[in-house]
Amino acid sequence: MPCDRKTSPDQHHALQIHRHHHRRKIRARVDAMQSWSAPSVPALPGRGPQLRLFDSADRQIRPVSPGATATMYVCGITPYDATHLGHAATYLTFDLVNRVWRDSGHDVHYVQNITDVDDPLFERAARDGIGWRELGDRETDLFREDMAALRVVPPRDYVAATEAIAEVIEVVEKLLASGAAYVVDDAQYPDVYFHAGATVQFGYESGYDRETMLALFAERGGDPDRPGKSDPLDALLWRAERPEEPSWPSPFGPGRPGWHVECAAIAMTRIGNVLDIQGGGSDLIFPHHEFSSAHAECVSGERRFARHYVHAGMIGWDGHKMSKSRGNLVLVSQLRRDGVDPGAIRLGLFAGHYRQDRYWSPAVLDEAQQRLHRWRSATALDGAPDATDVVARVRRYLADDLDTPKALAAIDGWAEDTLSYGGHDRTAGPTVSAAVDALLGVAL
């Protein structure tokens, strides 16, 4: 097992005294969060090729080789300001993964969480004069509506952090028992932290040096200056109860989960110790995915939590990354209210490669709407050129690290030929329409 630190006898005894009482109280919670309605996905003849993806940890494109059931965990939203196009780009990326896997013959066990207990949520709720649960429920409902409108295949398990408290506590108990975690010497707020050096492989997922880690840790929710920590990089596992904050009972005192351990616990409980893919936006590479992986590896003894770490690029608007803190958000719900076809939103985001940081603009949307119109016009004709080659190319391009620009260009070429010259194959239009629906999630 990578974690070789041990708790003191006193720490172990204290945990044993409280463990069973608190677990009985908390385990009454069950997964109740519902996802969204699933779109109808056509089954295409034959099977698509094996998926290859860029792995952030290995820094190269390599085959994803799941068993009969492919497994994927994608970090979900913190439910406020949902759903902006940065969110949409991430979840559409992994919707493509889901669709390509299914097209190649795999069942897919996809898990997504909702971080419905976190500081930014509390801050926004306080600013708006609304309860944090009410805000979280409202924004989660909006997110689900947006995902359904965008025809995203829903996860099999859609789990709120507040539904997984018992699972988090169990993971924290194991980390404390192994010595990979510790309680800070603070009588008022005895928070529980994870030793960043608890696994020998820590840092493999991001590949960042310590200086970069410290800078990103401070920028992305970490607390390097917290007194009492063994190392500035040590990550919060359990935040001791504070005034005006929600809390749950635990063997180590009332409090609430840290961010990273929520995902580790939810993924391990529903999928297992090793995932085929852990995914999210590129801003999650560090610290979130580095630490959630380290937590899981320390508990399981596995060398690597995910066989592939896959990250989508950021979406910008008006010269800056789209973010809640900056306030430069383009919301899916607003585009929908403006009458924009969700298929055009998908095509606009697919016009760039998923790993690239890219900008959304009126020109991007206009091009996507024109493309959608051309494709619909072409597939509606009674006769068209044979579609066998274009469908094979789309399958091949998407299986090659989700190369949507090439896939879109292939369909553009077929549509242009169809509109310019026509054809005699009356099945070609429906064939292309089914392929675009099944693989790209766009209804023609």
Swiss-Prot record:
Q: Where is this motif: 'ERGGDP' region?
A: 219-224
Q: Which reaction does it catalyse?
A: 1D-myo-inositol 2-amino-2-deoxy-alpha-D-glucopyranoside + L-cysteine + ATP = 1D-myo-inositol 2-(L-cysteinylamino)-2-deoxy-alpha-D-glucopyranoside + AMP + diphosphate + H(+)
Q: Does the keyword Zinc apply?
A: yes
- UniProt enzyme class: ligase
Q: Name one GO biological process term.
A: mycothiol biosynthetic process
Molecular function (GO) terms listed? ATP binding; cysteine-glucosaminylinositol ligase activity; cysteine-tRNA ligase activity; zinc ion binding
Q: Where is this motif: 'HIGH' region?
A: 77-87
Swiss-Prot/TrEMBL cofactor(s): Zn(2+)
The keyword ATP-binding is assigned to this record:
yes
User: Do you know which HAMAP family this protein is assigned to?
Assistant: MshC
Tell me the function of this protein. Catalyzes the ATP-dependent condensation of GlcN-Ins and L-cysteine to form L-Cys-GlcN-Ins.
Q: What is this protein called?
A: L-cysteine:1D-myo-inositol 2-amino-2-deoxy-alpha-D-glucopyranoside ligase
Instruction: Show the taxonomic lineage.
Output: Bacteria, Bacillati, Actinomycetota, Actinomycetes, Mycobacteriales
The gene from which this protein is expressed is mshC
